Amino acid sequence: MKHFPQGSKLLAFFLGAAIAFTGCKKVDSPIAPPPVYTLDQLYGQAVGDAMVADSSEISDALWPITPDNPDLQWKTINGQSYVLLASFMRYPDSYPAGDSITTTWGEAWLFIPKQMKDRIGPSFKPDSDTIMRICQLLGLPPANQKSNTHIAQMWVKAAALYRPAGNPAIDTRRSGAVLVNNVSPAYSTWFNNYIIFAYYRPLTSATDAHYPWTRMGYTYDWAPDASKVGLSEYVLQASSGAWVEKVSRAADFFR
């Protein structure tokens, strides 16, 4: 029979315990990668999120349409003051450069050209999908055969604009999603009808879509990893006059 010194017995005991503990150690599960969503899924999530608005989503950085806003361009035409805004559209022939137009087809949703250029212009590369990125920024469906293709910059009267938000005033820097008390009955009707149009109307074709209308004065940017606070948005009333400054293909707008 072999005899071991007392210290050797203790060492053997602790080594055996360590081996046993190591053998029973829990193996951590690998971290699951984040889910990958399709463009249609991302857009659908944006619509669902925009449908339910709360005060934490109010932006204090809306661009006001005021003469003292240095980011705006103004021009006097026939003795009247006009501000330069832009429309993302797909009927360039309806916007003859240098000529006046009347929006007989209905209201036009507009944005400030400089704000769009500042927001996404630096991110574009030669192989970028410009149409898709604009669609994301403006809260429009993923690019498809019915997507807009051109941007028309035009001079419009500030008095013919309203902000499609709880507060339609265009000279403020913030708006909630709930109607303020002093809106006109006509605007209240428009606002409530547009809620139905944006979220609940029946879709009749594969290219029809609901919209992530925030009701807080900014577009919903649904691009992955982007702030959902997009561009300040404005609506030009139906049958309003405007002067077309320039029409560009979407990619050329940023050059």
What are the residue ranges of the model-derived segments?
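ADP-ribose/NAD+-binding catalytic cleft of ART/PARP-like enzymes
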Residues: V27-F111
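Sec-dependent N-terminal signal peptides
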Residues: L10-A18
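Solvent-exposed loop/turn segments at secondary-structure junctions
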Residues: R90-Y91, Q115-D118, A159-Y162
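Conserved NAD+-utilizing ADP-ribose enzyme module
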Residues: S29, L138-R255
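Bacterial N-terminal signal peptides that target proteins for export
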Residues: M1-L11
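A general structural signal for short secondary-structure junctions and capping/turn motifs
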Residues: K2-H3, W74-K75, L140-K146
